[in-house]
């Protein structure tokens, strides 16, 4: 009798003997070691510290140097966390000072564009699983927050014509357009910003919004397609939209 047949008999519990083996396997599977809180709490923090230190060493001696080597410019105090971004196509990358970029991101340049360029301004943050596809240009201003799983789509991945798609032709160059994100913008998680859009200074894009048109400065947009749902007043010190908010009717449109 082979091992597979033996395992089948145990799972089926065919008779007293195989039922006993099954019960023994269940007991073995549920054996637990006792938890000693002081000891295991210490071991937990030791593991956590060792893991963090290992990630720190990998970041400063491996991940960041590799990523910087393919960028046109990287400013001071740049922080790359959780690995190295996946980069597709030819892409000129310019990064300012005090920028934090999550390594689990995708940065892609359109192959039909002569010089697709990505600019990330001072003090900006790019979160987890963000996708940025660059047509001619994606320009992110200063102190911009781009949350997890945001997509900035600067060009079409495929042509609209089905025959061209079947022939594996790229989308026409003319279908790529810039995306401009001005200073102090917050793009919330899972939002999508499409090609040709400008997000005005101090604006906020709500979670899951799909932005198809320009967003005025100091407004909040939500929905699909995104519409203005609130207007913000800049803070008196000019640091951003920290003042009074005015709701907008459901049918108000961008612009």
Label each PLM-derived region with a short phrase.
Residues 116, 139, 157-164, 192, ...:
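Conserved SAM-binding loop
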Residues 167-179:
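A short acidic, glycine-rich active-site loop
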Residues 133-139, 190-202, 209-212:
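Beta-rich strand-turn-strand
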Residues 1-154, 182-183, 201, 217, ...:
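Domain-scale signature associated with acetyltransferase and cell-envelope carbohydrate enzymes
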Residues 91, 116, 136, 175-178, ...:
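Glycine/small-residue-rich pyrophosphate-binding loop that anchors the diphosphate of NDP-sugar donors
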């Amino acid at each position: 009798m082979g091992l597979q047949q033996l395992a089948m008999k145990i799972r089926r519990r065919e008779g007293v003997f195989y039922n006993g083996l099954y019960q023994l396997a269940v007991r073995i599977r549920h054996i637990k070691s006792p938890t000693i809180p002081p000891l295991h709490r210490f071991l937990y923090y030791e593991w956590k510290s060792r893991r963090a230190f290992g990630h720190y060493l990998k970041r400063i001696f491996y991940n960041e140097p590799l990523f910087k080597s393919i960028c046109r410019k990287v400013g001071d105090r740049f922080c790359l966390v959780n690995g190295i971004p996946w980069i597709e196509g030819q892409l000129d990358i310019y990064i300012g000072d005090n920028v934090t970029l999550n390594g689990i991101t995708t940065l892609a340049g359109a192959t039909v564009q002569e010089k697709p360029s990505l600019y990330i301004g001072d003090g900006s943050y790019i979160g987890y699983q963000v996708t940025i596809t660059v047509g001619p240009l994606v320009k992110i201003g200063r102190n911009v927050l781009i949350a997890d799983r945001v997509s900035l789509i600067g060009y079409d991945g495929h042509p609209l014509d089905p025959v061209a798609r079947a022939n594996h032709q790229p989308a026409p160059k003319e279908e790529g357009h810039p995306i401009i994100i001005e200073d102090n913008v917050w793009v919330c998680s899972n939002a999508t910003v499409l090609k040709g859009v400008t997000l005005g200074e101090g604006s906020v894009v709500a979670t899951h919004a799909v932005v198809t048109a320009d967003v005025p400065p100091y407004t909040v947009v939500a929905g699909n397609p995104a519409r203005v749902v609130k207007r913000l007043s800049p803070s008196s010190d000019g640091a951003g939209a920290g003042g009074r908010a005015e709701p907008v009717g459901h049918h108000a449109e961008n612009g």
